[in-house]
Amino acid sequence: MAKFAFLPADFAPGDAKSAEFDPSQVEVTRIGSLDDPLFEFTYGRLWEQFGPAGELESRAVLGRRMAWDAAQPRAGFAMRYDLLLVRSGGEFVAARDHTAIADARGAVVHLSHLLVDPAWRRGGLAGWLRALPLQTARACLAAAGFPPGAPVTLVAEMEYPDGIDVARDIRLKAYERAGFRKVDPAVVHFHQPDFRSFAEIDASQPQLLPFQLILRRVGREADSYLTGGEVRTLVERLYHLYAQEFRPADMQAVWRQLDAYPAADAPVALLPPTA
């Protein structure tokens, strides 16, 4: 894949103002392996933000993901993981990572972590960073030989608004302004698998983590609903991604939750993320 570029055509509808940001100020580097000289620098910055809360995968897990080849199916899907570092004059500006999970029907991109240095916030850079995963989706589709124009959906798992966590509320409002929508949590109860160590899980019961699904259906951002079948397809891809690292027994509880999802043709509302 060629270097990541700043492509205004990939903006979410509400991120058009980000075009005012001059991308020549920064450079984007894809970290290709644990041996990359920039890996520890990038991982360290992400760890400072997400590690203490247990929200960042281990080096080993990310190393395995970076080695994935989208031309070699995993669980029947092409998968491509990208860890991106943004710098200006050699200094840290931002980092983000995400994974495309694709087949002939299209690509779902799981948005993992996004960190922007405070000095670079509220200047338009975040809109560009929300658009970069589309390039990962297209690269994944191309490597697997799937149609280049196949549908793409970006999905982030976010905690529910609580009116207390200010940073969380700001993040949800930013995605709402950009044009992302939330799958109605009153109808679809999404959970992550248990991220604790195997020893902790074995000493107790699996603890599933409730999250809301925040989506951008590229080219379909104005849609007010999707179907139960579309939700199920999306969540199945996320679970297939998690299943690459989790034990089958630890995935059983989340797989079972799909049994309670709406019927394939049932409409499921897409709501503002702060609703």
Task: Report the location of each language-model feature.
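Short, well-structured alpha-helical interface segments that form or flank functional binding sites
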Residues: 106-109, 124, 128, 132, ...
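Conserved acetyl-CoA-binding loop-helix of GNAT-fold acetyltransferases
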Residues: 116, 122-144
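Hydrophobic, Leu/Ile/Phe/Ala-enriched alpha-helical segments that form helix-helix packing faces
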Residues: 42-51, 133-141, 178-179, 242
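A conserved beta-strand-loop-helix scaffold within acyl/acetyltransferase catalytic domains
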Residues: 33, 43-118
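Terminal substrate-recognition subdomain of acyl/acetyltransferases
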Residues: 1-36, 49, 145-275
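A generic structural motif
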Residues: 102, 115-120, 162, 220-222
